[in-house]
Amino acid sequence: MKASELRAKSAGELNQELLELLKAQFSLRMQLATQQLGNTSQLGKVRRDIARVRTLLQEKAVQK
């Protein structure tokens, strides 16, 4: 997910996206623990997406 796509979203939409990403991260961690995860790079991608969303939420909070 690109930062430019995220910047177009509102704070509410970003919070919703963050919740979805956190659920996905939890699911991937459980798959990793049970050795069902084939592509471990997905964990890093989701982690970076979470960081992007949190950064944009913080930027929006500072702008207010």
Curated annotation (Swiss-Prot):
GO terms for cellular component: cytosolic large ribosomal subunit. GO terms for biological process: translation. Keywords: Ribonucleoprotein, Ribosomal protein. Disulfide bonds: none annotated. It holds the Pfam family Ribosomal_L29. One of its GO terms (molecular function) is structural constituent of ribosome. HAMAP family: Ribosomal_uL29 (MF_00374). Belongs to the universal ribosomal protein uL29 family. This is Large ribosomal subunit protein uL29. It comes from Aromatoleum aromaticum (strain DSM 19018 / LMG 30748 / EbN1).
